């Protein structure tokens, strides 16, 4: 549905030359929810704006539904963009128009008959859960409701693709979840292809089928969500995954934790499990093999793309030789082990 080939984008600011994208290629199949994650300034907004040519690539080709956009005339491009809806971090609603009027706007600009506009807008507002808000104005809506209006407006022309530019980053966590569930439902009902960009791995984890990691204008890692969470290949992907798990050292342990070993101490470990290592009974196996005992302090597990992953804080009791052997064995079995200190 979306095929980007060798996309490069260069900006010129006075005497400065900024390369925002460098030889980016990616294919997003029809009906898929595809996420692009990266830090601020990584190039993700430039990338998504190249899909509908809000930013025209310096080099490369953009195919959407088999049509090469970079060679179209302005009138042809305007027509092609009707098949590409887009929502943003800021909702860009017209304050002087009602909810109905905002959703109806693209249909009015396309000279759609009034009866058809009424039918289509009513259908869309029901789809996004705002069937009772036809006559409300944006000033009377919550942030989540405003984004729902923006989604309905983006779908008014019955597009095949929906682009989401940090669409939930201005929303609170509960509202973010509801908007993501709405996007997932729309994808399922309409078979809509969704390309979203975000700096939050929680967004990717919740609804995406595949994900690409962008850094300094390049896609440095890309795969299914389950594969990236199970076997992240780059430090940046690992960092984003770690950001979805929050496990603090309890206060009483913080007070006792030492950076260097001391008499009768035990190491405190941070264990990171992904993929097959989550389900395997590795801690009980270390106890059996190496005569160590693990005192679990706290743990957190989660799912992404049907795959479990998680982290655990534990004290490992045993001789120095046995604990070192147990740690090495865990690492051999794809558990990331960090010695936080000694207690």
Curated annotation (Swiss-Prot):
The subcellular localization recorded is: Cell inner membrane
* Sorted UniProt keywords: Amino-acid transport, ATP-binding, Cell inner membrane, Cell membrane, Membrane, Nucleotide-binding, Translocase, Transport
Principal localization reads: membrane
List of residues binding ATP: 38-45
Q: Where does the ABC transporter domain lie?
A: 2-241
Listed EC numbers: 7.4.2.11
Q: Name one GO cellular component term.
A: plasma membrane
How it assembles, according to the record, is: The complex is composed of two ATP-binding proteins (MetN), two transmembrane proteins (MetI) and a solute-binding protein (MetQ).
Protein name (Swiss-Prot/TrEMBL): Methionine import ATP-binding protein MetN
Record organism: Shigella flexneri
